[in-house]
């Protein structure tokens, strides 16, 4: 009987359920009565988000083999055969950690949204639709379906910004949709080009595209378009300007979803498409990714240091930390690429915690200007402790997840011999500047908020209260995996190391083939990148 139950669980459509359950449940919300403060809707949304999280955990426990590098939990249903479109979902080591992260952060974001009283039905409807849509982005195995789910996620974010944002919410929401929807056209063009390549019958499945022998020029064209599209979402400097504006106007739960999940979609897509499906082009553009990663780290760290708005300071900090993802993806090292994956998970947790605290602090002080915040530590001691713990995690304190992921990226890049020694030394030295700046701007931020001379107007008028049990619980739920991963990173790395090794081997083979074909001859890349001995 137990064997039958186990077989049934392994055959259960876990991923389809985790995608369709929150989206389908969201359409129940309009039938809730409009009277009251939305208490029933909040509890319903929280229940659905928690069940979705349990479904994703069930998919990992019952159907996912961490030693298998291939796609698992595969579901393939013909949807629109004339267009070559199938409902194809699955998970490998690169997608499963992010699926779990998405459902986990969303459940906490629903709890963070407990104070929302304005249009609660629409708010939680959008959150649940966003939950299913973001899981779908990481789970789909069809490139055209990937484009559709990528676009589906944009609509809830736009509405959450435009309706519940700050005074400049319309500008921020419009800028977000122009940047992200506008750049998404490159995903559609690349999907159509790759799906129709060499055939009149389109096939958009990842497995088919990975087996295709795309020409070098074709790969380069697709790579550039996809780099722009995914670079907007990551974001890569100078395609980043929508993010500080979006974070500057968003509410705390939307902050958590933006920083915790949305940015990771860009990093995941770069791994899945640029590095995995276009290896020859990746061999040529990887040095550029390294340079862009270093620019992200330094530029965003310096800009964060200069910000006087708390939300924008943390937003630029996020951009800086995502630079390590770019370096890891371009490193051609199993350790470096593994570090990029871990950095996405780590920053998802840390970014969500910091932005939640930004929202909680604003709810009390009603200001985001650091010049108006000072001396509130005496009134909010628990809040100060929470801020300190999350800031230490963000500055990569040993024993926390950020330290491990950044160390893996640095070590993987510096010790790998694919790049020449001078290039590695210069890039690592420049990136280290950003690492040094991080504790400076974060610790100075803590000092300005919680220490110094008290602002009498702020203290007297706002009647500041300390952290509530709900807020402590949310931060505790985020800090637990942050510390757990920091102390024992194999909790996460074991789930994707087989897939990462397979990806890196594929890219190293592409470098060797490119060198034999003299692709780098006549360019300066051969002074940076050299063919490995495989």
Swiss-Prot record:
Listed InterPro entries: NADH_Q_OxRdtase_chain4, NADH_Q_OxRdtase_chainM/4, NADH_UbQ_OxRdtase, ND/Mrp_TM
GO terms, molecular function: NADH dehydrogenase (ubiquinone) activity; ubiquinone binding
Catalytic activity: a plastoquinone + NADH + (n+1) H(+)(in) = a plastoquinol + NAD(+) + n H(+)(out); a plastoquinone + NADPH + (n+1) H(+)(in) = a plastoquinol + NADP(+) + n H(+)(out)
Compartments reported by the entry: Cellular thylakoid membrane
Chief localization: membrane
EC number of this enzyme: 7.1.1.-
GO terms of biological process kind: ATP synthesis coupled electron transport; electron transport coupled proton transport
GO cellular component: plasma membrane-derived thylakoid membrane
Source domain of life: Bacteria
Residue spans crossing the bilayer: 12-32, 44-64, 96-116, 120-140, 144-164, 176-196, 220-240, 251-271, 285-305, 314-334, 340-360, 384-404, 425-445, 472-492
Membrane topology, record value: Multi-pass membrane protein
Matches recorded under Pfam families: Proton_antipo_M
Keywords from the named record: Membrane, NAD, NADP, Plastoquinone, Quinone, Thylakoid, Translocase, Transmembrane, Transmembrane helix
Physiological role: NDH-1 shuttles electrons from NAD(P)H, via FMN and iron-sulfur (Fe-S) centers, to quinones in the respiratory chain. The immediate electron acceptor for the enzyme in this species is believed to be plastoquinone. Couples the redox reaction to proton translocation (for every two electrons transferred, four hydrogen ions are translocated across the cytoplasmic membrane), and thus conserves the redox energy in a proton gradient.
Family affiliation: Belongs to the complex I subunit 4 family.
Protein name: NAD(P)H-quinone oxidoreductase chain 4
Provenance organism: Prochlorococcus marinus (strain AS9601)
Gene: ndhD
